[in-house]
């Protein structure tokens, strides 16, 4: 079979999963982080393909369902540098919801246990603001050298930066 005469399309068949656009800003040049970013993007794409947004579900419940399924899938994968407690980790309090606490979706650690990347899933239109990126870094006890990688349905994957002199973010539109 050649490209000139492709196979017939079968109605109702699924041919490819959702693919996330990975903005170049989401890639760090560090293979451990970049390989994990790609694996997590594929995992989130598979999760997205299993959930259909319906108006009666509402955006908040849809987001909760996606986050829960993604967390379960990431824990089950056993990816290097991501232990089960590194998924939906709460910083700044004993439990999620405590005043002043923050929750990260996924933390990636190096071989000695240092946080080397923070991943945040977004299912709606709102992305990570520079103030939120700074708060995540502060509560996780890391500096600006640790990338915060936004995994967003509307915008793909992008990296968030917070600089002491000011703030900016890189978005894929």
Map each language-model feature to its residues:
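Catalytic toxin/effector domains delivered as secreted proteins or via bacterial secretion systems
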Residues: 2-173
């Amino acid at each position: 079979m050649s490209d000139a005469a492709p196979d017939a399309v079968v109605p109702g068949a699924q041919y490819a999963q959702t693919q996330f656009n990975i903005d170049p800003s989401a890639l760090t040049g560090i293979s451990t982080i970049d390989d994990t970013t790609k694996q997590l993007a594929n995992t989130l794409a598979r999760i997205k393909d299993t959930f259909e947004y319906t108006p009666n579900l509402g955006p908040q419940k849809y987001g909760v369902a996606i986050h829960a399924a993604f967390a379960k899938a990431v824990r089950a994968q056993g990816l290097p540098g991501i232990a089960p407690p590194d998924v939906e980790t709460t910083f700044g309090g004993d439990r999620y919801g405590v005043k002043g606490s923050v929750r990260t979706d996924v933390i990636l650690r190096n071989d000695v246990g240092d946080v080397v990347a923070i991943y945040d899933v977004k299912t709606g239109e709102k992305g990570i603001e520079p103030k939120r990126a700074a708060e995540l870094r502060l509560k996780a006890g890391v500096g600006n050298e640790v990338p915060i990688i936004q995994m967003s349905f509307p915008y793909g994957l992008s990296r968030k930066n917070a600089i002491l002199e000011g703030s900016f973010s890189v978005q894929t539109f």
